[in-house]
């Protein structure tokens, strides 16, 4: 028998959850959540998209999204991607994006992190 996980126990790390969205954004669509801390600016999330979708938003951080149980639709700017279980996508800094289940139960894992973790600060790279 498959283990059933409730939305409340599977969803971790998001603030402002509602039945419609897992993102708190300003009028321009910029996400207001701080991911990680100033000393370690990275956060990882596990989300059950059966309970809500992730509304259109953007942020300065990079984001990796992995379909832990798919399929899931990931919309980035004007492109819709459908990720099957085990597939992932990289979302660049400043890219407008949204996520929703394609059908049935859908779970995702994501990592959101500052670009300086990859390129450093005050460098030419």
What are the language-model segments listed below?
Residues 94-124:
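Ligand-binding loop in jelly-roll beta-barrel domains
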